[in-house]
Amino acid sequence: MAKEYETVIGLEVHVELATRTKIFCGCSTAFGGEPNTHTCPVCTGMPGSLPVLNKQVLEYAIAVGLATDCEITRYGKFDRKNYFYPDNPQNYQISQLYLPICRNGGVEIETEDGGTKRIGIHEIHMEEDAGKLIHDEWEDCSLVDYNRSGVPLIEIVSEPDMRSAAEVIAYLEKLRLIIQYLGASDCKLQEGSMRADVNLSVRETGQKSFGTRTEMKNLNSFKAITRAIEGERERQIDILEEGGQVIQETRRWDDTKGESYAMRSKEDAQDYRYFPDPDLVPIVVSEEMLKEIKAKQPEFRTEKMARYRTEYGIPDYDIDIITGSKHMADLFEATVAICNQPKKVSNWLMGETLRLMKEKDMDAEDLRFSPENLSKLIRLSDARAINSSVAKEIFEVMFEEDINPERYVEEKGLKMVSDEGALRRTVEEVIANNPQSVEDYRNGKEKAIGFLVGQTMKAMKGKADPAMVNQILKELL
């Protein structure tokens, strides 16, 4: 009988925090600067430089901990993780091993069978990011950019509670939403502000002890994470089926090839010779500080969904999609505040917005158009200044450039023609030029009138009022 295997998965999720300055110095965290321009003696590890903790990093870490039901460590410290690598100018990383800021939390996820499952969070700790090595353009050397060195991170370490790729994605989506709602990070995997390392092992179904785990790196999308989990599961099962042993190691996933390769043996904590950082004072979290952070907690998704049902009266499906992104929820509320038309705003977000997002493979966090301009577009439609096809045409431009739709209509001459005399003359010409369609309609073929409406709209360059065209056609026929 073939053996059945269970997958056991734990995650280490690194989140780049949305502070303006780095964790231990005043250098900018802005993305995209010239190499080595956002640096100073502290974040490049110069002798004699002393770090000072950015208070906002601590506040963000505590806020995430509270939102994930963690215990907050009231007295904590930083530790040095010692290793040598060119992107690590100090030859150690300041992190937290012994007294992480948050412990023993968890989040509820929805499972594929419609139930819920709690995924435990072992700890959340603060640490600094390393620099960035650039290998691609040179064969005999690598370059290093220290702009990222010292950028603040939190690492969220889960318990090994996940059993499938679907559970992993549900957990990551839940974490991402919580952190985005807090404003602690934009959590964009493709830009590296959220990164997940997957620790995975397999064991025979029913076995209590864990198998040997590997750590999968270079995962920058949910699709890559799913493929990496499925690929690594199969690789480990094949090894066990052939009588071999899985090696504890770190592996790099190559998404283009759909396979992983070994990078190095997997280290344990003792390999890094951790010790308390002597340059940083202990962290003391007072009751007053905790109260202040709790008081700033936003309205999270569950509460927002309940409010939308009573306040806006839009369908549950729309509510689920809109609140699934903080940016889209903010966009919805800001637009409704201007035009007071929740159903129409929801229709634009659920219709054209989702269509274009799918077409362009975009996240909701990347939407560029403003609430003001979406409100103007809705007003133009309501005032029958433009017809629905022109409105969609304008929205496509607005989706890319956030143009002012009122100005665009004036500049492009897109205002709807509702002059009955002009419409009647055009309809008469269309009737004269399409005798077969006229005969078909008079013989009971209702679809023929749709063709005649289309021909009229074409003649009017899309600027006619379709309802008036339809009315005039029926009158003349």
Give each language-model segment a name.
Residues 191-204, 309-331, 342-360, 372-374, ...:
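Core structural elements
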Residues 64, 232, 335, 348, ...:
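Amphipathic alpha-helical segments in well-ordered regions
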Residues 1-299, 316, 337-341, 355:
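Basic, nucleic-acid-interacting segments
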Residues 168, 319, 345, 391, ...:
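Small-residue helix-packing motif on alpha-helices
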